């Protein structure tokens, strides 16, 4: 039976990415060597690294003055790197979930942090609006998509301050006005590659203005200067990222990804809203296109374990909700085929008939 992969991350990758990466593990670029054993300094891998970064610039329409870098450490290291490199006196942060809260905690090590608004009062089930950002903030940091709670900000905030964003789980799912941002960062394991590489898009002239020494590995300038090769890069994830980027381009680019993602999410949300057994967990206007969170209606709560087993038997993988929310979560990243979403919906309908 074909499995339908709804894991929140590491998550589904396109067949194109998996097949090409698997072939390269056997024999990379006709070298007679595995991708797992080549030198990262070989001209063949340098070409991969360069092409991947160039494709990111092309797909996201990155303007002049920005550089794309690959690093290790995940988004969690970026929580530290951003304030290390940008925070002089004060930064503003929006608290919309666990990962935003973790970023705030790290930033407080480097200066004053103004949490302009938080949705913690309602277990992060909405995106705050109408907040004020101090004029003297060095930057405004937000998390565009909240994988645990299923909320998302799908538009670039219209504020005068420079933006910094954790786009780990929705980058490449919509057009972005990069010119509004100082830094965009993203762990790869949702919409790009296997875990192990982190992407950052950095406005070069935003760097070099803080009054503190920055450790070499935590300085964005280090990685920009060395073309993401300051230390040995994660070769396999970068190669897989290139395959994903090629697939995005082949599919029609970011606009095509957005159209498909919106359609997939609508199919599932429509069923959640129709089905007597289920309900969504977040404000409708803030529903994530990437991570659809839902629970059993109160009168059917006792069926939760039964549905989980039923869905698993039907080939659904990874729909258990995060422990802090409970219920279910279906992650619909860019590689998610419509057929898998339709299979989950059919499963929900059939379970409803039985109850």
From Swiss-Prot:
Q: Out of the domains of life, which is the source?
A: Bacteria
What does the record's cofactor remark say about binding? Answer: Binds 1 pyridoxal phosphate per subunit.
Q: Could you tell me what reaction this enzyme catalyses? A: O-phospho-L-serine + 2-oxoglutarate = 3-phosphooxypyruvate + L-glutamate; 4-(phosphooxy)-L-threonine + 2-oxoglutarate = (R)-3-hydroxy-2-oxo-4-phosphooxybutanoate + L-glutamate
Modification sites for N6-(pyridoxal phosphate)lysine: 190
Query: Where L-glutamate is bound, by residue?
Result: 41
Q: Which InterPro entries match?
A: Aminotrans_V_dom, Aminotrans_V_PyrdxlP_BS, Pser_aminoTfrase, PyrdxlP-dep_Trfase, PyrdxlP-dep_Trfase_major, PyrdxlP-dep_Trfase_small
Q: Which GO terms describe its molecular function?
A: O-phospho-L-serine:2-oxoglutarate aminotransferase activity; pyridoxal phosphate binding
Q: List the disulfide bonds.
A: none
Write out the annotated subcellular location: Cytoplasm
What cofactors are annotated for this protein? pyridoxal 5'-phosphate
The EC category is transferase
Any one GO CC term of this protein is: cytoplasm
Keywords annotated in UniProt: Amino-acid biosynthesis, Aminotransferase, Cytoplasm, Pyridoxal phosphate, Pyridoxine biosynthesis, Serine biosynthesis, Transferase
**Binding locations of pyridoxal 5'-phosphate:** 75-76, 99, 147, 166, 189, 231-232
What pathway annotation does it carry? Amino-acid biosynthesis; L-serine biosynthesis; L-serine from 3-phospho-D-glycerate: step 2/3; Cofactor biosynthesis; pyridoxine 5'-phosphate biosynthesis; pyridoxine 5'-phosphate from D-erythrose 4-phosphate: step 3/5
SUBUNIT field: Homodimer.
What is its biological role? Catalyzes the reversible conversion of 3-phosphohydroxypyruvate to phosphoserine and of 3-hydroxy-2-oxo-4-phosphonooxybutanoate to phosphohydroxythreonine.
Q: Which protein, by its recorded name, is this? A: Phosphoserine aminotransferase
- Species lineage, top-down? Bacteria, Pseudomonadati, Bacteroidota, Bacteroidia, Bacteroidales
Gene name? serC
């Amino acid at each position: 039976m074909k499995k339908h992969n709804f894991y929140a991350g590491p998550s589904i990758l396109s067949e194109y990415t998996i097949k090409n990466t698997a072939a390269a593990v056997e024999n990379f670029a006709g070298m007679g060597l595995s991708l797992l054993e080549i030198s990262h300094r070989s001209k063949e891998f340098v070409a991969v690294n360069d092409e991947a970064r160039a494709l990111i610039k092309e797909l996201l329409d990155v303007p002049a003055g920005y550089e794309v870098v690959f690093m290790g450490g995940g988004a969690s290291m970026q929580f530290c790197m951003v304030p290390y490199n940008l925070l002089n006196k004060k930064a503003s942060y929006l608290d919309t979930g666990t990962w935003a809260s973790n970023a705030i905690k790290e930033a407080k090590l480097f200066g004053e942090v103004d949490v302009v608004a938080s949705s913690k009062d309602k277990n992060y089930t909405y995106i705050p609006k109408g907040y004020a950002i101090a004029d003297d903030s060095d930057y405004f940091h937000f998390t565009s998509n909240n994988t645990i709670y299923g909320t998302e900000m799908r538009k670039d905030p219209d504020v005068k301050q420079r933006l910094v964003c954790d786009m780990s789980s929705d980058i490449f799912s919509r057009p972005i006005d990069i010119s509004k941002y100082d830094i965009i960062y993203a762990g790869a394991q949702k919409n790009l590659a296997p875990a192990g590489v982190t992407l950052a898009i950095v406005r070069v002239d935003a760097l070099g203005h803080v009054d503190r020494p920055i450790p070499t590995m935590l300085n964005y300038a280090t990685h920009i200067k060395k073309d993401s090769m300051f230390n040995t890069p994660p070769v396999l994830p970068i190669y897989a990222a290139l395959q994903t980027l090629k697939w995005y381009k082949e599919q029609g680019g970011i606009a095509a990804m957005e159209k498909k993602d919106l359609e997939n999410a609508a199919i599932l949300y429509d069923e959640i809203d129709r089905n007597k057994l289920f309900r969504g967990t977040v404000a409708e206007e803030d529903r994530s296109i990437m991570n659809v969170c839902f629970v059993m209606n109160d009168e059917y709560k006792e069926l939760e374990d039964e549905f989980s087993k039923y869905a698993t038997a039907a080939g659904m993988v990874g729909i258990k909700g995060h422990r802090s929310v409970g219920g279910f979560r279906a992650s619909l990243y860019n590689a998610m085929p419509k057929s898998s979403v339709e299979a989950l919906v059919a499963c929900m309908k059939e379970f409803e008939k039985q109850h």
